[in-house]
C-alpha cells in the first residue's frame, strides 16, 4: 500500500514536514514470479535535531505530575467472515530502508504501530501480502472480493472484539494513493485494510495497484 501524502508518489520520499511515503514490497523473488508489493505508509517518527529553546512565558502554572499516556492495546486478529478472511495481526514498524515491515508470512498481516489502533481517532492501517511465489495465495487476497456492507471483526490483545462495516473498496495505482487520508491520525475512527492488486508487472517484480478497503465502526 502506498500512501501519498501531499501528492507524493508511492515509494518516493515526501518533502520535509510531511510523513515519508514508501512502498511496502516483498523481498526479491524468482524472475517473473507473482510476488506482491504492498502499500507504503508514512515513515515512523525519527529523532532529529533538537528544536530551538523557546522563551519561557511569564505565567506561573500549577505543579503537577504528567498524566500517564493511555495504554495501547494492539489488534491481534482481523476477520471478514463473509469472504473467508481470518488473519492474525502483529505490530509492525519500518525497516532500515524506510519500508513498512510487513510480515513475510503471507498468512499474517501487520498493523502499522506508529498510527492509531482500531477505534482510536484516525485511520488504523493493517496490510498484508496478497501472495508469494513460494507460499502461494495470502490471507489478505480475500480483500479483493469484499463489498460495502461486509462485516469486519477486529480482536485486540485484551480479547476485546469490535465490529466494523466496509464502506468502500478501491483498486488504486500505487503512484496515486492518497497517503494523507490513508494514514491520518485524527478524525473519526476508520479501519484501512490494504494488499496488492491489479496486473502483475514482471519488470518491477510486483503488482501495479493496491486494493484499499475502508471500514467504519458498526455502531
Predicted region positions:
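N-terminal export and membrane-targeting signals
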Residues: 1-14
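Solvent-exposed, non-transmembrane regions of membrane-associated and secreted proteins
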Residues: 17-148, 153-158, 168-219
Amino acid at each position: 500500500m502506498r500512501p501519498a501524502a501531499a501528492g507524493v508518489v508511492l515509494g518516493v520520499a515526501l518533502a520535509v514536514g510531511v510523513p515519508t511515503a514508501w512502498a511496502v514490497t516483498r523481498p526479491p523473488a524468482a524472475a517473473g514470479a507473482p510476488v506482491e508489493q504492498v502499500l507504503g505508509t508514512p515513515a515512523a517518527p525519527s529523532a532529529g535535531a533538537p528544536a530551538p529553546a523557546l522563551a519561557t512565558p511569564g505565567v506561573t502554572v500549577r505543579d503537577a505530575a504528567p498524566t500517564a499516556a493511555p495504554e495501547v492495546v494492539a489488534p491481534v486478529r482481523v476477520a471478514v467472515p463473509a469472504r473467508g478472511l481470518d488473519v492474525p495481526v502483529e505490530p509492525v514498524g519500518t525497516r532500515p530502508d524506510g519500508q513498512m515491515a510487513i510480515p513475510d508470512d503471507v498468512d499474517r498481516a501487520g498493523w502499522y504501530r506508529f498510527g492509531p489502533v482500531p477505534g482510536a481517532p484516525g485511520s488504523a492501517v493493517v496490510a498484508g501480502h496478497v501472495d508469494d511465489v513460494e507460499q502461494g495465495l495470502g490471507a489478505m487476497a480475500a480483500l479483493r472480493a469484499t463489498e460495502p456492507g461486509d462485516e469486519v471483526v477486529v480482536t485486540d490483545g485484551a480479547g476485546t472484539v469490535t465490529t466494523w462495516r466496509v464502506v468502500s473498496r478501491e483498486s488504486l495505482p500505487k503512484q496515486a494513493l492518497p497517503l494523507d487520508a490513508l494514514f491520518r491520525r485524527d478524525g473519526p475512527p476508520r479501519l484501512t485494510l490494504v494488499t496488492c492488486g491489479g496486473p502483475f508487472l514482471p519488470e518491477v517484480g510486483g503488482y501495479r495497484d493496491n486494493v484499499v478497503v475502508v471500514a467504519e465502526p458498526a455502531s
